[in-house]
C-alpha cells in the first residue's frame, strides 16, 4: 500500500523541491526510498509546513527524521489506497507575506476578489516547458490583511500552477501601489497574456496545508523540533532587522537621508 508523509522544511536551504542536485527531493529519497508522488513542487526559497510525498514504504518517523538533513522534518504519515494521486487535493493553502510600503489595502482586496473563481490563469503561470499543463483551475479564496508593517495574503485553491501565487501576489501588491487597477487584472483573466505578470520574491511564500480529508498519524517530536527551528530563525532575522532599522535611524539623525 502507498503511504503519504507530511513534510515541513525551510525552503531557503534548498534549490526548490525537485530537478536540481541541491533540491529537496533527493534528500527525501535517501530517507524514504522511491518517491511515487508529491503534493506540491515548491520553488527555491519557498518553505512548507505540510507538503506531502508518497512512497510504498511504512517507516518509523523517528528513523526517517534521523536520515533527513537540517531544516527538514517528516511529522505525519497516513496509509492511502492504491492509485491515490497526491496532486488531487481538496484544497491547498498558502500564505504570502510582504512589507507594507503604504499600499492601499482596500484596492488590494478588490484586486484579490477579481482573481477568485474558476478561470484560465495563463497570465499568472510560468510554463515549465510542458505546453499541455492545464491553465484553468479554481481559487476559492484570497484574503488580504495588514498587520503593522506587513501585508499578509492568504491563498486557498484547488491547485496552483508554477509561479501562480507569486505572480498573483505581485499583481495584488501592484494594484495597492496604483501601478495596476482591478480592471487590469480582470482583463488579464478574461484575455490571458502569458508572461505579462512578474513574480513576487519566493522567500515571502509558505505552503501551510494540503487538504486531502485524511487523518495523519502525527509524530510530535518532529513537530516540536520544526517549531523550535522556525522560532529561533525568526528571532535571529528579527534581531537583524532591528539592527538595520537602528542603522537607518542613526543615518536619519545625521541628516544623511
From Swiss-Prot:
Coiled coil: none annotated. Its EC number is 5.4.99.12. Substrate binds at residue 94. SUPFAM superfamilies: Pseudouridine synthase. The active site is at 43 (nucleophile). It catalyses: uridine(38/39/40) in tRNA = pseudouridine(38/39/40) in tRNA. One of its GO terms (molecular function) is RNA binding. Keywords: Isomerase, tRNA processing. Pfam families: PseudoU_synth_1. It comes from the Archaea. One of its GO terms (biological process) is tRNA pseudouridine synthesis. The keyword Iron-sulfur does not apply. Belongs to the tRNA pseudouridine synthase TruA family. Formation of pseudouridine at positions 38, 39 and 40 in the anticodon stem and loop of transfer RNAs. PANTHER family: PSEUDOURIDYLATE SYNTHASE (PTHR11142), TRNA PSEUDOURIDINE SYNTHASE-LIKE 1 (PTHR11142:SF0). This is tRNA pseudouridine synthase A.
Amino acid at each position: 500500500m502507498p503511504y503519504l508523509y507530511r513534510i515541513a522544511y525551510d525552503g531557503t536551504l534548498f534549490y526548490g523541491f525537485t530537478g536540481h542536485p541541491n533540491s529537496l527531493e533527493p534528500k527525501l529519497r535517501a530517507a524514504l526510498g522511491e518517491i511515487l508522488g508529491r503534493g506540491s513542487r515548491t520553488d527555491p526559497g519557498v518553505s512548507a509546513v505540510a507538503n506531502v510525498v508518497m512512497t510504498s514504504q511504512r517507516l518509523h518517523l523517528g528513523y526517517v527524521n534521523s536520515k533527513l538533513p537540517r531544516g527538514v522534518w517528516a511529522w505525519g504519515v497516513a496509509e492511502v489506497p492504491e492509485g491515490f494521486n497526491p496532486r488531487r487535493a481538496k484544497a491547498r493553502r498558502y500564505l504570502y507575506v510582504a512589507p507594507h510600503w503604504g499600499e492601499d489595502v482596500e484596492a488590494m482586496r478588490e484586486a484579490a476578489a477579481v482573481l477568485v473563481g474558476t478561470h484560465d490563469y495563463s497570465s499568472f503561470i510560468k510554463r515549465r516547458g510542458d505546453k499541455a499543463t492545464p491553465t484553468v483551475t479554481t481559487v476559492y479564496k484570497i484574503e488580504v490583511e495588514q498587520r503593522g508593517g506587513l501585508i499578509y495574503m492568504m491563498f486557498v485553491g484547488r491547485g496552483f500552477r508554477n509561479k501562480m501565487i507569486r505572480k498573483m501576489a505581485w499583481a495584488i501588491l501592484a494594484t495597492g501601489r496604483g501601478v495596476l487597477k482591478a480592471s487590469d487584472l480582470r482583463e488579464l483573466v478574461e484575455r490571458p497574456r502569458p508572461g505579462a505578470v512578474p513574480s513576487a520574491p519566493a522567500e515571502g511564500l509558505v505552503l501551510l496545508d494540503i487538504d486531502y480529508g485524511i487523518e495523519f498519524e502525527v509524530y510530535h517530536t518532529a513537530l516540536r523540533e520544526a517549531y523550535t527551528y522556525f522560532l529561533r530563525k525568526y528571532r535571529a532575522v528579527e534581531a537583524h532587522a532591528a539592527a538595520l532599522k537602528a542603522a537607518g535611524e542613526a543615518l536619519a539623525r545625521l541628516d544623511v537621508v
